[in-house]
Amino acid sequence: MPTRLFTSESVTEGHPDKIADAISDAVLDAMLTEDSHSHAAVETVVTTGQVMVCGEVTTEAYVDIADIARSRILDIGYDSSSKGFDGASCGVSVAIDAQSPDIAQGVTAAYETRHGSTDLIDSQGAGDQGLMFGYACTETPSLMPLPIDMAHALSLQLTKVRKEGALDYLCPDGKTQVTIRYNEDDKPVAVDTVIVSSQHRAGIDLDATMTPDLRRLVIDPVLERYDLDHKDMRVLVNPTGKFVIGGPMGDAGLTGRKIIVDTYGGMARHGGGAFSGKDPSKVDRSGAYAMRWVAKNVVAAGLADRCECQVAYAIGAARPVGFRIDTFGTNHVPETVIERAVGEVFDLRPGAIIADLDLLRPIYSQLVAGGHFGRELPGVTWELTDRAEALAATARL
């Protein structure tokens, strides 16, 4: 029987790029806590002993960015130079400017308003041009692709084991990767390969200690959650042989460099825009969240088994310049019917998305590690299937 393989990866909160994401979103959340209408584009770079936070903001809030950065680093677990980073002693530099007034005028007085529209939702334009994708499928209960779902489960379990102290030699940096075998009907049938790489203290025996420990406490508990054959699975733990130097000492980290990890693990297309550090007026974030909401409701409504949605915006304009759906031949009604139903049930103007999903809240830090989609977390409204019934009814009129 012909089969194919598909692979997705995840990273832990201690990965350098995720440290940067965590700081950017912690600063954003702090601003939204004091001023829910803050506009922010916060970028972070971390390297050996150093953090730099830069970007543009418009806010009435006062936040101590250096203190937030240090606190977030310590929360992740970098509290000693022996781990490659220490939030208490690292240098933190801040270079934050005001948002460009040229951009701001397009967000607060959109193209439609300037051309006569009196609709309040038309007054908020997109914070940038761009295209965003959303995806859902029936491979998992969360309607996420199986490879990324399992990869995230492994990375979150690895962090849990470390933070609970079950394996006191583990350090914060880590990565996971899962390869799934699909049959000729494009259904997942087996786990082919699992890779777990974790930073650790020096002197730990990989074969005698670390591999069996991670198999017992990380890999096996995660595999038990999935009804999938794994008897012939290959397991690779720290395949370089050791992983002592990690975190920003091993690699510099930048905000927005794990966009595939943050979304669908490569199973769906990506418009290129990152999430962390951006308030929801940035459609890179709010548009992508809305597309997941739409795609998940299409699948939950039984209109398709797989659904990828694309939306596109012009900077300063409220109404999307493009929208399309691809169901990869799994649709149960014509795709044109699904697109029409989505247009009737969902309002994809930025102001409507922000209001409908209640995005002006400090909810973003919790999403930094483990993905922005498929999560059952407080305030993650884009995972609701609250419009599936309306979609189904509209599509079948």
Swiss-Prot record:
Q: Which domain of life, per UniProt?
A: Bacteria
Query: Which residues are listed for K(+) binding in this entry?
Result: E43
Identify the CDD domains for this entry: S-AdoMet_synt
Q: Where is this region: Flexible loop?
A: 99-109
GO molecular function per UniProt: ATP binding; magnesium ion binding; methionine adenosyltransferase activity
Q: What is its EC number?
A: 2.5.1.6
Q: Which UniProt keywords apply?
A: ATP-binding, Cytoplasm, Magnesium, Metal-binding, Nucleotide-binding, One-carbon metabolism, Potassium, Transferase
Residues reported in the UniProt entry to bind L-methionine: E56, Q99, D251, K282
- Signal peptide (UniProt feature, chain positions): none
Assembly and partners are described as: Homotetramer; dimer of dimers.
Protein family:
Belongs to the AdoMet synthase family.
Q: What is this protein called?
A: S-adenosylmethionine synthase
